[in-house]
Amino acid sequence: MTNKKAFKETCKFIAGGVNSPVRAFANVQSEPKFISHGKGAYIFDIDGNSYIDYVQSWGPLLFGHCDKDIQKACQKALHKGSSFGAPTLLETELAKLVLSDFPHLEKIRFVSSGTEATMSAIRLARGFTKKDKILKFEGCYHGHSDSLLVSAGSGAATFNSPSSLGVLEDVAKHTLVAKYNDINSVKELFEKNKDIACVIIEPIAGNMGLVPAKQDFLEELAKICKNNQTLLIFDEVMSGYRASYLGSYGINHIQADIITFGKVIGGGLPAAAFASRAEIMDILSPLGGVYQAGTLSGNPLAMAAGIASLTKAKKKTKLYDKLGKLAKKLTQGMKKLADEKGLPLQACHVGSMFGYFFTKDPVSNYQDALKSDLALFSKFHKNMLENGIYLAPSQFETGFICSKMDDKIIDTTLEAVRESFKRI
């Protein structure tokens, strides 16, 4: 069966033909590739085509596809049982592994998705502060829970809808929206609202394209939260163990009250988490009155994959230097080639994350990102795919480098960029 036939068939049974909207390739006027398997830095579709994969399952695969150590850990766990609905020692081991490197985090709770992690973190913040409102930033995506689908990035940006049908006004009214990297917009909202329970932010935004928050902005944001008895939540579902081993904390050294994790923490399996100091975490049920639960939370296969992934990342001291150098080579190479062709392009990287925008002006917030030439991006994406390079099918997503990539792969990619720029 071909990709085209597979998508047509799938659309008969799965809404939209996909289980997450961006996978449909709708915003690049194309149809998705159905993947048969992956190996290292490559994926292979059912038509027999191979691609250098810069999506890496949207970030979780720090060590690429089919990493032997992670596979071995999963197989060992599977032989003992796939799920118990009861505590296992694997949960404790992964909890210790995560918390050991964050001096301000004392306890953690595992869930199955980033959406669950951010949703639970906000409920926890409201329960702890006894306040109602939350403040988020325009273009930051924190999953698809109702209160966070307001001025969201990622899928919402891709499909030109700042919110979603089905989100009640009574829910949305409790969500305040500030401008990313603009501290004055934050101050204005705090002046008008005295009941803000938490501020949630991607300290390294990856869902309006890659847009890092400025150091002075984050420092001032932390001060405002502290002065107003408002909890600061860093959503590191994407940037955790990607920007550095310690995520944004390893770069900005700001101690958020709550951190959410995901993607890499599960080693490619469904897992996420939220963590904080004990006095906050201890109001979670069964100790306190904030309820959170999940049938597959702390699933042993996901815990085993997470332990293997993080242990390997921690041992390889030069891993992040290597990934960062490759990401830098890629983005600088893209910028140079674009300049040579007179194409408007902004490109940057943070650790193993990279992003690019088809716009002539620097991008520091959501409105800047929206100025990108989407038609140009669509043409570029199509040409890169034809040249064997699998990039995220949205201008408003982030790309990822994995450990199985090397200079040769980056050189191959840049040659594809050169050819694609010639055609567009």
UniProtKB/Swiss-Prot annotation:
The keyword Isomerase belongs to this UniProt entry's keyword annotation: yes
Modified residues (N6-(pyridoxal phosphate)lysine): 263
Gene3D superfamilies per UniProt: Aspartate Aminotransferase, domain 1, Type I PLP-dependent aspartate aminotransferase-like (Major domain)
Keywords attached to this entry: Cytoplasm, Isomerase, Porphyrin biosynthesis, Pyridoxal phosphate
Broad class of where this protein is predominantly found: cytoplasm
SUPFAM superfamilies: PLP-dependent transferases (SSF53383)
Name of the top EC class for this enzyme: isomerase
Catalytic activity: (S)-4-amino-5-oxopentanoate = 5-aminolevulinate
Cellular component GO terms, alphabetical: cytoplasm
GO BP annotations listed: protoporphyrinogen IX biosynthetic process
Keyword Isomerase: yes
Transmembrane segments: none
A GO molecular function held by the record: pyridoxal phosphate binding
Pathway, per record: Porphyrin-containing compound metabolism; protoporphyrin-IX biosynthesis; 5-aminolevulinate from L-glutamyl-tRNA(Glu): step 2/2
EC numbers for this chain: 5.4.3.8
Pfam families: Aminotran_3
NCBIfam families: hemL (TIGR00713), PRK00062.1 (NF000818)
Protein name: Glutamate-1-semialdehyde 2,1-aminomutase
Gene: hemL
